[in-house]
């Protein structure tokens, strides 16, 4: 495809995206809101990380310092109903690790290739952040039940593999016959089972919510796809589920986006119905589901404030080669 000049995400397209998001929020009973940043949790996370010896130097490129900002936002917004402060620090720290990996290793995948091997063989990883992550994951078996620890470790290893797969496949055309491949990569990279699991208090019987897990995962994946789409278009990111699915299905990105929003809203309703006999689980789910939306509205990473509050000026795409929605 020939290179194009930088273009604005058009006003019409912005309104289309905004309308899809607004309809989704309405169906899931989520009024638009921005949650203030929790500096107390931020300080607690940095203090704990330093105690553990994790790299958190503010000026180092091999540091979790900036990634902790994302971890604190998702924890405060999505897990505000969780009373165990140690769990909040754990979720924020886990998110900091995976955010760092997702951002730092997009073009340096040799570390990702070696992570599972060094982890399973209990060897020291040469990258300080990944060595700290391995240490963090190994402690899961001490902190949590077998089910939780197994979920954490297996999902984290899949996630690291998915980053490498996405990088290796970014210059490979998506086949129109490979309809399920974008969804497969999405499942690998989503970490949705971990985030769904921690939505419930650890002392809540797993039997009260486990049957809703498939739809919880679909909700988390679909909501993230929906609410990260605007930012990805502005940044000309194409290695994502919406872009890959649009190519494989030979439809527009907006059509895939509408379908993702519809599936996420449907999944939300299914979870509510499954959890109705269990009031505590239902309350936890509703708080998490709303908070997961607020994670995206509250994080500058996703730029939704620009869409909902600043339609006065078109935002120019950052790269010189991109495609229309």
UniProtKB/Swiss-Prot annotation:
Top EC group: lyase
Amino acids binding Mg(2+) 2: 224, 228, 232
InterPro entries linked to this entry: Isoprenoid_synthase_dom_sf (IPR008949), Trichodiene_synth (IPR024652)
Sequence similarity: Belongs to the trichodiene synthase family.
One annotated GO molecular function: metal ion binding
Keywords from the UniProt entry: Lyase, Magnesium, Metal-binding
Entry protein name: Alpha-cuprenene synthase COP6
Species annotation: Coprinopsis cinerea (strain Okayama-7 / 130 / ATCC MYA-4618 / FGSC 9003)
Superkingdom of origin organism: Eukaryota
Pfam families hit by this protein: TRI5 (PF06330)
Known cofactor(s): Mg(2+)
Annotated binding of Mg(2+) 1, by residue: 102, 166
Listed EC numbers: 4.2.3.-
Biological function: Alpha-cuprenene synthase; part of the gene cluster that mediates the biosynthesis of alpha-cuprenene and oxidized derivatives. The alpha-cuprenene synthase COP6 is the only sesquiterpene synthase identified in C.cinereus that appears to be part of a biosynthetic gene cluster and is highly specific since it catalyzes the cyclization of (2E,6E)-farnesyl diphosphate into only one product, alpha-cuprenene. COP6 is also able to perform the cyclization of geranyl diphosphate.
